[in-house]
Amino acid sequence: MSSRKKKDAEVAQASVEVNPDLDVEELEGVGRVTGAKLKERGFFTVRDVAFASVKELAEVVGNEERALQIVEAARKMLGLHSFVSALEVYERRKTIRRISTGVKALDELLGGGIETRAVTEVAGEFGSGKTQLCHQLAVMVQLPEERGGLGAKAIYIDTENTFRPERIMQIAKARGLDPDQALNNIFYARAYSSDHQMILVDQAKSIIKQNNVALLVVDSVIAHFRSEFPGRENLAERQQKLNKHVADLLRLADAYDVAVVITNQVMAQPDVFFGNPLRPAGGNILAHGATYRLWLRKSKENIRIAKIFDSPYHPEGEVSFRITEEGLVD
């Protein structure tokens, strides 16, 4: 390749790297027909393909060899095809955004708030404050950055019919936001099954592309999976399906710079005689899938305790907060 052509290629490469939403048909090896098939399955852009698995694309294009070529081309265009230095990773982490929880002590525990490009799991018993925290985050993300938000919208997937717009309005009013506008900035969907839940996550990608969305809530992530796959005989199938769902959430968070918050139920350990007999549901799939894991528990009256019990770099610790009419406060 001549120096001129090489330079032109580098310029073209750079232009694509800052435009991950380039139409999928611009990819090498993807024409109009293949592009139409990919779009039918939700792969609209170079970014969508770059974060997909070869197996997913093979189901669309017909074979794994061609799927691998397309995925590698997309990743190369976005600069995701090779190793980078740890310093580059560090510099990239500096661009991660955080959403304040509205509770100063909890923000400090989390290193500044809920991170984008990560999945934060919130586990705890019924009434421990999981859904309350989700409601508050859906409001907090709308605040300007100087007040702890990102000036953005939220997507809320409700699996247990616990979303209450009235609660959003209370919290929004307490934070100085117009209650009606706060509701208008939340894209809500009720999931009626695990399949429906996973479809909604796929649909969320289109909403994120077309709107300034920085938060995706799934409350709760495990409910439908537990009810649809009861008993040990169905456990393997359940975990396999749950694994795909969590992987989709992780990819979405990273690809679109979104904070993903999932709530989780608890289960009893009958063989535990000392300490807390409860543990988060979902087994190793959620344990390894979530980036950060919070445990909420009740204390006296309206006080709740939040403990971070799994994190790549946060030390374990716990703080208390109160649930009031205005929302969660120190």
UniProtKB/Swiss-Prot annotation:
Q: Looking at the keywords, is Nucleotide-binding present?
A: yes
Q: Does the keyword DNA-binding apply?
A: yes
Q: Which GO terms describe its biological process?
A: DNA recombination; DNA repair
Q: Per its UniProt entry, which superkingdom is the organism in?
A: Archaea
Q: Pfam families under this entry?
A: HHH_5, Rad51
Give the Gene Ontology MF terms in alphabetical order: ATP binding; ATP hydrolysis activity; ATP-dependent DNA damage sensor activity; damaged DNA binding
Family assignment from sequence similarity: Belongs to the eukaryotic RecA-like protein family.
Q: Which PANTHER family match?
A: MEIOTIC RECOMBINATION PROTEIN DMC1_LIM15 HOMOLOG, RECA/RAD51/RADA DNA STRAND-PAIRING FAMILY MEMBER
Q: What is this protein called?
A: DNA repair and recombination protein RadA
